[in-house]
Amino acid sequence: KHEMLKVVNFLDTILPKDKPRYLMGVGTPADLIENILNGVDMFDCVIPTRNARNSQLFNYDGKLNIRNSKYKDDFTPIDTNGFSVSSEIYSKAYLHHLFKTNEVLGLRIATEHNLKFYIHLMNQVKIQIKNDNFEKWAKEFLERYNNE
C-alpha cells in the first residue's frame, strides 16, 4: 500500500491536471480518500460488494466484521449516519444472525449498506472539495477511520 501511494503521489506531479485520473482496483474508504488527496478522480473496485458478502461492513469509524461474536447480542443499529434506512432499521445482532444462518437477506442488507456508505462518502468528498475544506476533512476522516 505504501508503495502504491508513493507511485500515485509521483504520478500526480507528472500527469496533466486538466485530465481525469483513474485508479483501478483500489477501494477501501481510506484508500479512496488518500488517493483523492493525490489527485485521483475515478475508481473501480469490488471491495464494497465483495466485503459485504464476507460479512464486513464499512462506516465512518472503520470496518466491522458482523460475524464476530461480539455482535450476537448487540441490538444497536448497523449505522446511524442517515445514509441508509436499512442500516438504521436492522440491528447488528439481527445481521449477525442472518450471516451465521447463511440467510441470503444478510448479504443483501450488508451490500446495500456498503454501497450506500460509499455513495455517502463520495458525496461528502464533493461537498468538502467545493467548500475548499477537503484536506482538513480528509485528515480527520483518516484519523477516525484508521483508529478502529
Q: Which role fits each region the language model picked out?
A:
Residues 1-78:
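Glycine-rich phosphate/ribose-binding loops and adjacent secondary-structure elements
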Residues 79-148:
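C-terminal extensions of enzymes
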